[in-house]
Every structure is written in C-alpha cells, then in structure tokens.
C-alpha cells in the first residue's frame, strides 16, 4: 500500500531514477542471495525519505491546479474561436515565436516554505499541448532550494520554447500572470550571525529574452560574501562576482540594505577561543582558592578539638634550648670561634684541624690561621 501511495505522489522524474537504480542492483542482490523483498522495502524507504524531505511537495498539485484554472478561464474563448485555433494548428511554427512570452505567477506567502518548480503552458497554447509534452517538460525542471526569507523565483521552459516564471509573494492569494521584463534582480540574504566567518549567499537572477521572442532559462549566480566579526562591527567583503552577460543592469531589491565594507587593516579580527577556557586565571579565582584552603584548615582544627586529640609537638623543635644555657655559654671561659678543615674521632678522642679563627684562653684573645687540637668526651 505504501508503495502504491508513493507512486502517485512522487513525480515521474524521481520515480524513474529510483526504479533505474533498483533495476541495476537487482542482479547483484540476487547473486548475493538477498531476497527481492529487500529491494522492494529499500525502494519504499527511498520514496518515503524523498517525501519526508519535502523536495517535491506540491510538484503535481500546483501543476494540476494551475491547469484547471487556465482551462476554466479560456474554455469559452476556445468555443468561440474554434476556427481561428484550427488555423493556428496548421501553422504552429509561425505562431509559437509570436506567442512565446514569459509570465509570472504570484503564489501566497503561506506556501513559502518550499520552492518547487511547476510546468504550466501558455493559456493560448493549451490545445496544442498534450500529456506527453507536459511530462517531458516536467522532466527538465529542477528544484532550487533557497534560504529562508528569500522569495523564490521559478523558471519553467516548455516544449514550445516558452519560459514561464512562477513567483511566490505575500501580496495576495490569487495567481496573477505578468509579462517578463528584461531586468536583473539581485537579492541578498544574510543569515543569523554566528562567531567566526560565515558565508552569505547572494542570489542574482538574469531575465533577458533572446531575439525572436524565445526566452532562455534563468541564470542563477551564487555570489559568496565573507562576513568578518571585528569587535562590535560587522564587515561584509564581497569575494567574487560572476556576470552571465557582458553588459547588464543591476537593480537592488526593494528594502535591501548593504553594510559599508571597511578595510580589514583598521582593526584586527577578533579570534574566538573554542577549545576550552582561558589559559590565565583571574585574581578573583586565586582569592577564592585561598579562602577555600583557609576554610579547610579551620575545619580540620575544629574536628581535632572535638575528637579530644592533643597535637604533638614536632621533632627538632627549639624547646630543649633554654635561655639559661645561652647565658652559661657566654660566661664560659676558653671559647674558640673558627672554621675547621677536618675532624677525626677515635673512640672518645677527637682531633680537630681548625683554621681562620679567634680563641679566648685564660682571659686572652688569640688569632690564628691554622690550629690542631685534641679533646676527649
């Protein structure tokens, strides 16, 4: 059921591509022992994905709707001028160049989400068109996905050499036919600004009919522009400009505002760091760390006091040195202050090799450069 439903909704162009791919890989799948049901499920899944992408939404619905409206409007004229139209059928090569005109169809803004292209013949050439010509013209149409906010302009080329332009606008819900003008429409779209350089596509459409009344297809030129963020300023620098014709007039779209391009040398572009936090810490962070360490020490002291543990005094403290010993040291006679080279000990005997010192012996001071002495203790 899903396959039959998708067959009616998916256009013939896309369905033919899907069928060709399935037929090409059918033998390979069968050689590998894969059931043919898998191919059918793959085809169904492919068509479902195509419909979910909305790439072909309204492809046939708009076509049928426009055909019915044009036929209803010109049905009385066909009955009154049957003889005149029969004469046109006898000489189609003379009438087609004169009647081939590019027309525009305005579609309401509620349908601006997608931009499919529709094949619609001229109102005076309805009787010359058949189902096969419409199908072949639909096979040559392409879908151009435009960014959000851009009014899609669609160009359709029929078998008779007519270029039909379908425009979606927000000024009404009626389909309005307008003749084509030889102008160049330039429309610039700047997406939401993000850090770093982004590309803003500029869609330029050239509408210029060729001599003889036959109009070519629309040329769509993508002009990328580089947007640089420098502090609080935004610079738009155009990179390349492509011209489809040697001489053409460029008319900016209504309401378009282009920021003034400033030289990049005035201010260095701001480089954003995206690989983590900064390399240096602020003074506030350091103060917070110190306060956190102090709080931890206070908590430890409180916990020790609550547990009733008495802190032991560390080793190598100066508690064993009293002031009285210092007084006794200076009151002692026979004091030597010097440097030493060697000190030898044999059991309780010590031998000193002294140098560059002063000694006080029996109340007298002596200065020496070298001295040797023995002692026991």
Swiss-Prot record:
Subcellular localization, as worded in the UniProt entry: Nucleus
Annotated Low complexity bias: 69-79, 89-105, 248-280
GO biological process, one term: positive regulation of transcription by RNA polymerase II
Alphabetical UniProt keywords: Acetylation, Nucleus, Phosphoprotein, Transcription, Transcription regulation
Predominant subcellular localization, coarse grouping: nucleus
Residues that, per the record, bind DNA: 344-345
Record's keyword annotation contains Coiled coil: no
Protein's name according to its UniProt entry: Transcription initiation factor IIA subunit 1
SMART domains in alphabetical order: TFIIA
